[in-house]
Amino acid sequence: MTTILRIDSSIKGEAAVSRRLTQRILDRLLEAHPDATVVSRDLAQGIRQIDGPWLGSVFTAPEQRTADQQEIARTADAVMAEVKEADILVIALPVYNFGAPAQLKSWVDHIARRGESFVYTETGPVGLLTGKRAIVAFTSDGTPLGSELDHASGWLRQVLGFVGITDVDFVAADRMVFGADEAMARAEAAVAALAA
């Protein structure tokens, strides 16, 4: 059975274009995988930023963690497990000031863990999360996908590839201030054309 992990990150809640787009992508995937299990994580509801106690907790063997470390590591381990168990990731990438939202960066920090999602070898890093697909809902007011102003999509593609997820598609509703209806129509067409 297919497991789909949906990651939303906009602070705009239900009014977010990226949230509407991740829902459309999810609907498209469910047409092809009606029995899929869907796991959703809304990063705007909060995800811990990494810090010293976080680092000490997640890199301590579970059986050696203190009670405080167990509590800190609980969410980090749950986030990591969600990604490991997913076959398809649907990730909202709203562009804030040319980059990704801080909460999406925090999610990436939770999943880019040496020994869990990648290892270093003599020939370089090797991602461990292979065999997965990611579909990214890229939204922006004025930043075109892939432009020199876009510091979000290349970063996310790099991070996903680093952990082994190389099958990545982008669906863009970009430059919304220059025509929201046209941008959404292009995004809808891209969703319809997705190989599910």
Swiss-Prot record:
- Would I find DNA-binding among this entry's keywords? no
Sequence positions that bind FMN: S10
Q: Which reaction does it catalyse?
A: 2 a quinone + NADH + H(+) = 2 a 1,4-benzosemiquinone + NAD(+); N,N-dimethyl-1,4-phenylenediamine + anthranilate + 2 NAD(+) = 2-(4-dimethylaminophenyl)diazenylbenzoate + 2 NADH + 2 H(+)
Going by the UniProt record, its keywords in alphabetical order are: Flavoprotein, FMN, NAD, Oxidoreductase
Report the EC code(s) recorded for this entry: 1.6.5.-, 1.7.1.17
Details of cofactor binding: Binds 1 FMN per subunit.
The secretion signal range is none
Lineage: superkingdom: Bacteria
Necessary cofactors: FMN
Query: GO molecular-function annotation terms?
Result: electron transfer activity; FMN binding; oxidoreductase activity, acting on NAD(P)H as acceptor; oxidoreductase activity, acting on NAD(P)H, quinone or similar compound as acceptor
* InterPro entries on file: Flavodoxin_fold, Flavoprotein-like_sf, FMN-dep_NADH:Q_OxRdtase_AzoR1, NADH:quinone_OxRdtase_FMN_depd
**Subunit-structure text:** Homodimer.
Q: Which family does it belong to?
A: Belongs to the azoreductase type 1 family.
Biological function: Quinone reductase that provides resistance to thiol-specific stress caused by electrophilic quinones. Also exhibits azoreductase activity. Catalyzes the reductive cleavage of the azo bond in aromatic azo compounds to the corresponding amines.
Q: Which HAMAP family does this chain map to?
A: Azoreductase_type1
- What name does UniProt use for this protein? FMN-dependent NADH:quinone oxidoreductase
